[in-house]
Amino acid sequence: MAAQIWYEDDGDLSVLDGKKVAIIGYGSQGHAHALNLRDSGVDVVVGLRPNSKSVEFAKEQGLEVKSVPEAAAEADVIMILAPDQYQKGIWENDIEPNIKPGAALAFAHGFNIHYGYIKPSEDHPVFMVAPKGPGHIVRREYVAGRGVPVVTAVEQDPRGDGWDLALAYAKALGALRAGAIKTTFKEETETDLFGEQNVLLGGVNKLVEMGFEVLTDAGYQPEIAYFEVCHELKMIVDLMNEGGLNKDRWSCSDTAQYGDYVSTVIDEHTRERMQYHLQRIQDGSFAKEFMDDQAAGAPKFKQLQEEYSNVRIEEVGPKLRAMFSWNNDAAKDADEANSFTGKIARAQVQ
């Protein structure tokens, strides 16, 4: 069955008339949501801790800023955009004690709702609008009159207006210009984690690292190995993004295509490992492991960060990336995105 997709005419901004929307967090997604909604005529307040470095950034953009409890107390819709591991504490300490009866809760990722770390009472609508792109792109596309696609879901709908709220929010974000795909909190969470762990990060990163090590261990120059297993990956991904697997194969030489078809690096054993990791996502084992580690001060996470930040390919990577002038433009994009909190990956209510 084809997915249901909504566009501009399917959302009604008037649904948000007379409602205040609190954006909790002003990181990568937070700044884009707050500014796009504000520019769409929505009454927006940003919720941050009083000592957050993001307070001044938000005020400089002309946004109203209050503490998280204050923002939650006056909002009709609360979009929580802090990292997964912090949302439970923010909910329990700052939002749940202050939230208005019947106020809607919104998320850009289903993790905490799906795994039960946040359990709103049944009188609160709960919906999700999850952009398929980083915040600075969401903002840039909105300003350009375009939009970034989103996936959207409704988990609780006590009044029957959950979808109206979700689509109105998506329209204010600029997302309906591109399209909003209907999903569920379960589907979004589990597929998102699966993609990260098995393909986008846990797959590609490890393929690149191992390919580099095999070539350099065999005596090839690190610089040449880097070009072959890392640099050229962008070309393939761009082709795939434009026209799928067929375009990326069609665009390569016959020799490259044949090598693709007969390669045995990814085989049924890989499928079995993917199925194992999917099971851990589905049964909550991965979520529990991650959240337990975070609650203990993240010792395993920090150990792994340190271990993987010192991989051999990064001994040569910075020098070679600097050879390509367009990487300087990419760095500017990253600086712009990071300027709100320091690091996209650490965007939080701090």
Curated annotation (Swiss-Prot):
It comes from Bifidobacterium animalis subsp. lactis (strain AD011). It catalyses: (2R)-2,3-dihydroxy-3-methylbutanoate + NADP(+) = (2S)-2-acetolactate + NADPH + H(+); (2R,3R)-2,3-dihydroxy-3-methylpentanoate + NADP(+) = (S)-2-ethyl-2-hydroxy-3-oxobutanoate + NADPH + H(+). Substrate binds at S253. This is Ketol-acid reductoisomerase (NADP(+)). Belongs to the ketol-acid reductoisomerase family. Pathway: Amino-acid biosynthesis; L-isoleucine biosynthesis; L-isoleucine from 2-oxobutanoate: step 2/4; Amino-acid biosynthesis; L-valine biosynthesis; L-valine from pyruvate: step 2/4. Its cofactor is Mg(2+). Mg(2+) 2 binds at D192, E228, E232. The keyword Magnesium applies. GO terms for cellular component: cytosol. NCBIfam families: ilvC, PRK05479.1. Binds 2 magnesium ions per subunit. GO terms for molecular function: ketol-acid reductoisomerase activity; magnesium ion binding; NADP binding. Residues 184-327 form the KARI C-terminal knotted domain. The active site is at H109. Residues 3-183 form the KARI N-terminal Rossmann domain. It is an enzyme of class 1 (oxidoreductase). NADP(+) binds at Y26, G27, S28, Q29, R49, S52, S54, D84, Q85, Y86, Q87, G135. Keywords: Amino-acid biosynthesis, Branched-chain amino acid biosynthesis, Magnesium, Metal-binding, NADP, Oxidoreductase. It holds the Pfam family KARI_N. The gene is ilvC. Mg(2+) 1 binds at D192, E196.
